[in-house]
Amino acid sequence: MNEEIFALERRLMKRTRQDFEQLLADDFYEIGTSGKTYTKGIELDTLLENTVVTELPDILNFRIHELSATVIQALYDTVEFSGRRSHRSSLWRKTNDTWQLFFHQGTSF
């Protein structure tokens, strides 16, 4: 399960519209590193139709905690090419054998 959730996190970092539509739950809520908050609708509105990020940040210290049979918390750090570092926390919910992200928070450090 660790590898599956890791792969889903990486997919979202590429910021494709298709992945956001599929992997973000309708009730998705994010608190960004800036302190701004985002919903699935806001995220989709900010994406260009064919946006793809090619320089993905490094992911360090990735681990998951099973909170229930259908909810997983992923914790990890990211290091971007600029050197910017963030602690990350994601909550994933499994519905009908499909994982969807319903909460994410990033904190710069």
Sequence positions of predicted segments:
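A beta-strand edge to alpha-helix "cap/lid" segment located at domain peripheries
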Residues: 1-22, 27-109
